[in-house]
Amino acid sequence: MFEEPEWVEAAPAIVGLGAATAQVRPATAPPVKGRKRRHLLATLRALEAASLSQQTPSLPGSDSEEEEEVGRKKRHLQRPSLASVSKEVGKKRKGKCQKQAPSISDSEGKEIRRKCHRQAPPLGGVSAGEEKGKRKCQEYSSLHLTQPLDSVDQTVHNSRTSTATIDPSKPSPESMSPNSSHTLSRKQWRNRQKNKRRHKNKFRPLQTPEQAPPKASIEETEVPPVPKSDSQESRAGALRARMTQRLDGARFRYLNEQLYSGPSSAARRLFQEDPEAFLLYHRGFQRQVKKWPLHPVDRIAKDLRQKPASLVVADFGCGDCRLASSVRNPVHCFDLASLDPRVTVCDMAQVPLEDESVDVAVFCLSLMGTNIRDFLEEANRVLKTGGLLKVAEVSSRFEDIRTFLGAVTKLGFKIIYKDLTNSHFFLFDFEKTGPPRVGPKAQLSGLKLQPCLYKRR
């Protein structure tokens, strides 16, 4: 006679839907976001609370009376949890949310309730067909409702877990573990296993130093590291070597300046007072010449090897007797200090040789000092007429090569060969024509060469 209100039939359907979906979905659902979703949630909870207070009639689409009785028992068990949830959430927003409840047509609502009640699970478990029906029901309801019922499922599940601690007669989710494994899809199960492997060691307790595996035995077998003292000593040794090299370089530059800025007699006295100074100077000199593309002594030795081995050679400023070791000729070696037993220590302006006793006189990078004229006159004295004078000198020392050659010819020589192609030194060959043509008081400005000074690097 009187039509029952719409919410009487809609409430049990929604309750059944919540019960069905609560067992399918996992326990952890994403939180409800948005104002409209919160309004819909509050409306649904209010409808559930109102429906539980009345006697729900049996639907005409049920299979048997036993299923109706099982549904009543299940709703009776869920009554305190749903009531508590509705009291907590629905009191503040009940009136406001009822105004914004979504409208569903009568035909759509009846069809949803019919499908959900037909697929209500028994208490014993959930079969595969019933599970399939639940999924269809969820998909159909999600198409017509603006808000999915994830939040409802989460609240129902939380209320069940809270009542499960109070009511021991209700089976816990852990006791339904055999059936819960079937509710996961293959992709969900795979993701769960992956997360387990990923977080395997995340919550493992930290090991105390006593529980840590012993490493002392491994370290004892290894080679002990180099002590700090040795490394410090090696650094100190390297520093000392660097400082010694710098000091040697500074002293070499000082000695080189003294040799070029004074007469040969002063240089001889210097090396007589400090014999180690000549060794230091010679090491520095060899270090500088080693960087040259060609050593001038090697070039002179190559020229002498093409001449007869019977020619007597006088090497003025021989150093370490490199020329005497490179040729077969008899060589008289003269220098300010001795680095070899074959060296005769003397002033190159006064060598202990007879007049016209040698065939070749060599000045290889040895025209040092301010008395170069004395060296060349001494070479003219000991050379035979027609003898060969070979001069090799640093190219940067010559300001005007023509004036230098003119001054040498006035001392009784004539130029027969010159090589200006080398970037580091010039090579000249002179032949003795006779005694000097100028007196000892004559000025020969062309014989003045620039001092070869080394810059600090």
UniProtKB/Swiss-Prot annotation:
Its EC number is 2.1.1.-. It is an enzyme of class 2 (transferase). GO terms for molecular function: methylated histone binding; methyltransferase activity. GO terms for cellular component: chromatin silencing complex; cytosol; eNoSc complex; nucleolus; nucleoplasm; plasma membrane; rDNA heterochromatin. InterPro entries: RRP8 (IPR007823), RRP8_N (IPR042036), SAM-dependent_MTases_sf (IPR029063). Residues 47-237 are annotated as: Disordered. Residues 129-138 have a biased composition (Basic and acidic residues). Keywords: Chromatin regulator, Methyltransferase, Nucleus, Phosphoprotein, Repressor, rRNA processing, S-adenosyl-L-methionine, Transcription, Transcription regulation, Transferase. Component of the eNoSC complex, composed of SIRT1, SUV39H1 and RRP8. Belongs to the methyltransferase superfamily. RRP8 family. Essential component of the eNoSC (energy-dependent nucleolar silencing) complex, a complex that mediates silencing of rDNA in response to intracellular energy status and acts by recruiting histone-modifying enzymes. The eNoSC complex is able to sense the energy status of cell: upon glucose starvation, elevation of NAD(+)/NADP(+) ratio activates SIRT1, leading to histone H3 deacetylation followed by dimethylation of H3 at 'Lys-9' (H3K9me2) by SUV39H1 and the formation of silent chromatin in the rDNA locus. In the complex, RRP8 binds to H3K9me2 and probably acts as a methyltransferase. This is Ribosomal RNA-processing protein 8.
